[in-house]
Design a protein with these regions (language model features):
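Proteins that catalyze or organize thiol-disulfide redox chemistry
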Residues: 1-65, 78-79, 83-85, 89-91, ...
C-alpha cells in the first residue's frame, strides 16, 4: 500500500531538481517527453521567489510523479534566462514534449499555484 506524505529524499530529488545550462536539455527538454516539467526561474535575492518556490515544490510533490520541477537560478544561468526571455522573476514555465505549454510571472496565491499545476498535469495527459 502506498501512503501519501511518506516520500523520501530520493523521491524528492527525482521530482525537484536544480538545473543549470549544462543539464537543461536532459532535465527539462528531454524529461518533458515523459511528464510535464515546471521550470521555476528564481534568484537568491528575490523576495517573492522565496514564497513561490516552496509552494510550487509542495504541489509538485503532492502530484506524486505526474509532474516534475526544475529550479534555475537566473544569476548563475543567464544564458537560459536570456533564451527564455525572462524579464522579471519569479517566472515559471511548464514544458511538455520539449515545448513551453504554460507559464506565469510573479508570485501567485496558493489556490492559483494549485490550479496551475493541475492544468499542467492535465495538459500532459
Amino acid at each position: 500500500m502506498i501512503e501519501l506524505g511518506t516520500g523520501t529524499a530520493a523521491d524528492t530529488a527525482d521530482l525537484i531538481m536544480d538545473v543549470n545550462e549544462s543539464t537543461f536539455m536532459k532535465d527539462v527538454v528531454e524529461a518533458s517527453d515523459l511528464v510535464p516539467v515546471i521550470v521555476d526561474f528564481w534568484a537568491p535575492w528575490c523576495g517573492p521567489c522565496k514564497t513561490l518556490g516552496p509552494a510550487l515544490e509542495a504541489e509538485v510533490l503532492a502530484a506524486n510523479g505526474a509532474v516534475k520541477m526544475a529550479k534555475i537560478d537566473v544569476d548563475q544561468n543567464q544564458m537560459i534566462a536570456g533564451q527564455m526571455q525572462i524579464q522579471s522573476i519569479p517566472a515559471v514555465f511548464a514544458f511538455y514534449k520539449g515545448q513551453p505549454i504554460d507559464g506565469f510571472q510573479g508570485a501567485l496565491p496558493p489556490s492559483e499555484i494549485k490550479a496551475f499545476v493541475a492544468r499542467v498535469i492535465e495538459a500532459g495527459g
